[in-house]
Regions:
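A composition/biophysics-driven feature that prefers long, compositionally simple stretches
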Residues: 1-182
Length: 182
């Protein structure tokens, strides 16, 4: 029985960090976050090369996202919610589509994501906006953390910076802070 490249990658991820490591890293971030705050961390997206082609091979997940989840895939979102007691950790992933997987590669399942990250509250990515709207309308959120770090001013903003700016527009009364120093 042969092992696929995807299964090999999963085995490597399991070796590099255990669920306990990722859980303790997330807990350290939650401990440093202000009360009544959330952290939203995007893994990143694929980039267009041309009108009908994506750059699938050089796309990399945000390193801080990987550090907190152990998942190195695009189009995922980690949400840490410190507006409720106890604090909640949620992960949003893409739903598998057999046709798309044939062309672009296999997606991580909910079970695999839970096994690697230790996060048990996992939803599909299309639930993210409604979940954020629910959090923002039902909880007292004063601060939202995003990974807005840029090494130099001339660096192009990554997807987290773009999403942080969208969040500022959608929720102008909520302070947006950089997650990086935590």
């Amino acid at each position: 029985m042969s092992v696929t490249c995807f299964e090999q990658a999963l085995q490597i991820m399991r070796i590099r960090g255990s669920k306990m490591d990722f859980e303790s890293r997330r807990q350290r971030i939650l401990d440093k976050m202000e009360d009544n705050s959330i952290a939203i961390l995007y893994s990143g997206i694929e980039h267009h090369v041309s009108a009908d082609e994506y750059d699938l091979f050089t796309a990399q997940a945000n390193r801080n996202f990987f550090y907190l989840t152990g998942l190195r895939r695009d189009n995922m979102v980690l949400v840490l919610d410190k507006c409720v007691e106890p604090a909640k950790t949620m992960l949003f992933i893409e739903e598998a589509d057999p046709t798309m997987e044939r062309w672009y590669g296999r997606k991580v399942t909910m079970e695999e994501a839970e096994e690697i990250s230790g996060i048990d509250e996992i939803e599909y990515i299309y639930e993210l906006e409604s979940t954020l709207d629910r959090i923002m309308t039902r909880e007292d959120v004063y601060t939202a953390y995003f990974d807005t770090y840029r090494h130099q001013k001339v660096d192009l903003p990554d997807y987290n910076v773009v999403k942080a700016n969208e969040f500022k527009t959608d929720y102008p009364g909520v302070a947006v802070k950089n997650l990086f120093p935590l």
